[in-house]
């Protein structure tokens, strides 16, 4: 059996955020075409302070061939079965085992506890390697999980919990970026909530027969992108920037019909010979796209310094950084190129710029 999985929709009202309802509607419509009859929503279906779920009920009633299984998340802890009227909605506000071709354990978000503590209360009914965990919170592997801008740790699942209780797979909400780490899968948000959630959005399809995970695109009303350019002074700074801009736009891999949905934030930082020319080129090159909150390209962190000798040194330093041998240093512990170059330029130019 194939089951669709999403999370972190953060519905408000159709009036305030129609794009979020449209994204969920697109998922439900896609399931009919794919022949999938179950959708799991792993928490934060609703945004905080939303207590009337009637518009969601109406949407589900329009797609009554799909059974929707959902748990509360940290933003919608009041989700419970009695709040829904649609016949095809199942809300689990306490740990619940559900047979969907195999055993799924739905663990609703609970403040002040861990997923492992909840799993421990159900372990006698869970056959190792034969059950799937659905939860909402942080998967803790000794480092902070990227993709959440919320402080603290929310209902953590530890690697030791997986080793101890042996779920076959884990499907989690809370992190808005799609990611996979071993058997732990985050679908990510199906519609970007703000400029920090960039690119195309997807939902997951989980195959209960073989644990295969695949992604399926969501046709969203908006597509957020952020582009940041590290500028190093030189006679070729404009030609380099133009080439870099073209490559960035190409990397979005959007077709013509999607370009009008882009909401973009652009910034340039570092040092240059001609700040106005950089600003003009950014504005011209991205002129066909709508900018987030109608903001112009941000060049406030771009300084001018025409010292050719320092520019030559900066170019050489960049080459060394690009060829740096990190050895056995884990990827997640490595500083990014721009982060290193920012520090290097401050040393080279000593803050000397205008």
Model-found features: residue ranges?
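Accessory, non-catalytic peripheral segments of nucleic-acid enzymes
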Residues: 210-354
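N-terminal active-site segment of His-dependent metallophosphoesterases
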Residues: 1-58, 127-129, 334-354
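A conserved active-site cap/scaffold subdomain adjacent to cofactor or substrate pockets
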Residues: 173-241
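His/Asp/Glu-rich metal-coordinating catalytic cores
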Residues: 38, 47-185, 189-194, 205-207
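A structural signal for the main folded, soluble domain(s) of proteins
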Residues: 1, 25-33, 120-123, 142, ...
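Short loop/turn motifs at secondary-structure junctions
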Residues: 2, 35-36, 129, 166, ...
